[in-house]
Amino acid sequence: MGGRETLDPDPCAATIEAIRESCPDLPISLTTGLWITRSSERRLELIERWSVLPDFCSVNFSEDGTNELCDLLLNRGVGIEAGLSSVADARALIDSGYVGQCLRILIEVEPGTKDPIRAAAAICRVLEGAGVRLPRLQHGMGEQAWPLLEDAIVHGYDVRIGFEDTLTLPDGSPANDNAELVAAALRLAKAPSRS
């Protein structure tokens, strides 16, 4: 696919099967981002044709067709991770009626947000106000990646880090690979001030 994201059944199946063979106990998630197909109808058509299913999918509650997508995934036995990038997304999730069917909340503040920590906290306040107690994973992209990861550690949320999120280490130097990013995240999580 030349490095492009896809929801096409064959490459998705091949990827999931390869990961399961290599790491059989690793839960596998796929994104369902609308930017991949640019059409909510096309996205549904492709996912309906999946022959090998991930354990769960990330569903962005800012996108059109979210309810239909959640219905399809749940009917196929695929879990939902609710992707929230704003307070409006948090409210959309709460209003959707899918909160109780989600596995986790994915807080991913939009790149370029002036105060990403405050934006993430605002999303969390909406969730807490509605009694949403699902596990949370919080991450950011680019220069927001490390501050949001550290904030997630402080709050006891799950984290993720990789080249999809940032190409640099906390000190701003280039990372050689994903393993170096993960090692840096582990050092932050184990820092004495975090104990």
What feature does the model see in each segment?
Residues 1-2, 31, 152:
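Histidine-centered divalent-metal-coordination microenvironment in nucleic-acid enzymes
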Residues 20, 27-56:
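Glycine/small-residue-rich loop that forms an oxyanion/phosphate-binding "nest" at active or ligand-binding sites
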Residues 58-164, 169-184:
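Catalytic alpha/beta core domains of metabolic enzymes, predominantly
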Residues 5-8, 36-38, 65, 89:
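Acidic-and-aromatic substrate-binding clefts and catalytic sites of carbohydrate-active enzymes
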Residues 1-15, 168-170:
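Glycine-rich, proline-tolerant flexible connector loops at the mouths of alpha/beta enzymes
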Residues 186, 190-192:
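Expand to "…catalyze enediolate/carbanion chemistry for C-C bond making/breaking, isomerization
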Residues 9-13, 43, 119-123:
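Well-ordered, non-membrane alpha-helical segments in soluble/globular domains
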